[in-house]
């Protein structure tokens, strides 16, 4: 594209070209196998420590069978939005089971997790309203807030004093919504929900929690952040995704029945998007059943997390304040982060680089994520290789 200012903007985007020239490009890496603890890349075995499949259910034969059965019964797609011809009986069944799971009156499905934040934020709030966001909230929360045309205010990461100060300066009679990640996707720490909800009640603000990385990980039977703290009644909206612990694709929002009914008829990402495919719905239903009936998956996830965290700390890795299976290993240099990611893949370990602008350059890191299905031998092998690569890269954060 070479037309005018748009062409100029495109031509100035050089980072991909520069990384490829250095052999450090680490995105869109094609995987030739199932998303499991070991994957195949370029025909080679690679240990997978970059997946969000926390419970390792993407390869569960019962879930695969449920998806196959749904394909036979309903076909490959719904050919319309939920608002019109795209609602199946299994959509309704899943909504009912999800709302009961997270302790809310009702739920509405979205075709992706990203849309699950876009929809509520963009239609519930308006020009004279205020949305308060943690500065480390997911991009979908930020974009949904922008689409609402409301006044967006960011507070310091998990900084409740800053949140209180910013709420105190807002008009008392204004509509206010605090939206936060439950488990933060880059750092792995958990929101201080007890203090946040206390402040919200003090200032008459609603609360929405993004449980994308919390479902299947924390809370009673993996029911998420509000359940983890026993604060279901203090959280107005719970958002979750199916692409992580629930081994599928899509998302949902749960809350009071009247709010969900409002979303069904006003959230554009429901009304103008084709509905979740039958196979995705059926696989989510089966995964939800497994999570609720087989606690050993979550127990094993946490055993692996505790084991890996202890081993990494013993070797001197900087893990920040993580409290979850997301282990951020800080490198604090964009270029070294890319170099470490590439060298680890060459050595058979897949991790995800997190660099600016996703985080400040001085907080760049690799994200090392655990699955319930990892073995201790796999964890040991990956850490041994990381120690070697970090030393080769002269990463200063390695003690």
From Swiss-Prot:
Pyridoxal 5'-phosphate binds at residues 113-114, 213, 241, 243. Pathway: Lipid metabolism; sphingolipid metabolism. Its cofactor is pyridoxal 5'-phosphate. GO terms for molecular function: 8-amino-7-oxononanoate synthase activity; pyridoxal phosphate binding; serine C-palmitoyltransferase activity. One of its GO terms (biological process) is sphingolipid metabolic process. Homodimer. This is Serine palmitoyltransferase. It comes from Sphingobacterium multivorum.
């Amino acid at each position: 594209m070479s037309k005018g200012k748009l062409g100029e903007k495109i031509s100035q985007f050089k980072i991909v070209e520069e990384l490829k020239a250095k052999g450090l490009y680490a995105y869109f890496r094609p995987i030739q196998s199932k998303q499991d603890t070991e994957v195949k890349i370029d025909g080679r075995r690679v240990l997978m420590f970059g997946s969000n499949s926390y419970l390792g259910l993407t390869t569960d034969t019962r879930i695969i069978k449920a998806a196959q059965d749904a394909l036979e019964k309903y076909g490959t797609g719904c050919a319309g939005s939920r608002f019109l011809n795209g609602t199946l009986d299994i959509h309704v069944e899943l909504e009912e089971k999800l709302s009961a799971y997270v302790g809310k009156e009702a739920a509405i499905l979205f075709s992706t997790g990203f849309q699950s934040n876009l929809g509520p934020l963009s239609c519930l709030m308006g020009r004279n309203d205020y949305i308060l966001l943690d500065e480390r909230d997911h991009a979908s929360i930020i974009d949904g807030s922008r689409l609402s045309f409301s006044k967006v205010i960011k507070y310091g990461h998990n900084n409740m004093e800053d949140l209180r100060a910013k709420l105190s300066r807002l008009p008392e009679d204004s509509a206010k919504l605090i939206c936060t990640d439950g488990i933060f996707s880059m750092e792995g720490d958990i929101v201080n929900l007890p203090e946040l909800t206390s402040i919200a009640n003090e200032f008459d603000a609603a609360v929405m929690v993004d449980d994308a990385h919390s479902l299947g990980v924390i809370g009673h039977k993996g029911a998420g952040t509000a359940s983890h703290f026993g604060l279901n009644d203090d959280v107005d909206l719970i958002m979750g995704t199916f692409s992580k612990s629930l081994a599928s694709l899509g998302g949902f929002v749960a809350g009071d029945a009247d709010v969900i009914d409002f979303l069904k008829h006003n959230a554009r990402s429901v009304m103008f998007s084709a509905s979740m495919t039958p196979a995705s719905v059926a696989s989510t239903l089966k995964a939800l059943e497994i999570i609720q009936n087989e606690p050993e998956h979550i127990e094993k996830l946490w055993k692996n997390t505790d084991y890996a965290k202890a081993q990494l700390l013993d070797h001197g890795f900087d893990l920040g304040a993580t409290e979850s299976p997301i282990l951020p290993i800080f490198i604090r240099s964009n270029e070294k982060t890319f170099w470490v990611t590439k060298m680890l893949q060459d050595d058979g370990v897949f991790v995800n680089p997190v660099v600016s602008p996703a985080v400040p350059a001085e907080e760049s890191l690799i994200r090392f994520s655990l699955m319930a299905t990892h073995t201790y031998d796999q964890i040991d092998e990956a850490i041994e290789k990381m120690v070697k690569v970090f030393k080769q890269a002269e990463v200063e954060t390695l003690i």
